[in-house]
């Protein structure tokens, strides 16, 4: 498995003609650099599909759309793959309006209607619950995320979907790994494919191999109508920000280390760790020389 940024040319993805693609690509840049970026992201999504068998038994997906660069990018790439005949799954875009102050309610439905994507926008005032439960000065993100996830599961079931598809990328996975490493005392990250606790829905992250910088460039070029993620006034947790800064510093000092770290997560050697639940150390013994 090669998860470096420059994956070898994929003949099935093919060349991209200027202006080619689904409706949302109508105003996309006509440049070699953008086409290379687009093709790289498409290959990385397809590689995640293959590596984690994401398409097995899948007919309909609920695509979580927050209004941020990552979820917009995810939706665009999935639509691009459908346009190319490389993805047969039906897509439903979904945004959960959580009652955050100043949330621009018109942005997502207007955009999704314009590009002709089936969608569902639902209002659930989880913001008031978070305000009530979280102490003053603490970050809302963790509880807000859990409440959002529960509602998205419900909506996925109501829409007859097989999976909830989310826009987490390479950096999200690495940051989660180091948060668990430094603060949780365990080796765990954010899986690319997960069966929910009830066992009736998959959670898929097709952008697992995609770099955040690439997604930011893609979003800027596509001119997605971005909705800021800090409308509630809360900021990302200090722990995650510290991990983000640490990873950025490592990448500046030693370019390419993020790809190396991500590759390490798929090359685990239990016999060289310290968990007897993963490896039977009691079975080891010195060979009798006689």
From Swiss-Prot:
**How cofactor binds (record note)?**
Binds 1 [4Fe-4S] cluster per subunit. The cluster is chelated by three Cys residues, the fourth Fe has a free coordination site that may bind a sulfur atom transferred from the persulfide of IscS.
* Span of the signal peptide: none
Q: Which GO terms describe its biological process?
A: tRNA thio-modification
Q: Which parts of the sequence form the motif PP-loop motif?
A: 66-71
Protein EC: 2.8.1.-
One Gene Ontology CC term in the entry: cytoplasm
What is its quaternary makeup?
Homodimer.
- Name of this protein: tRNA-cytidine(32) 2-sulfurtransferase
What broad taxonomic lineage does this protein's source fall under?
Bacteria, Pseudomonadati, Pseudomonadota, Alphaproteobacteria, Hyphomicrobiales
The gene behind this protein is ttcA
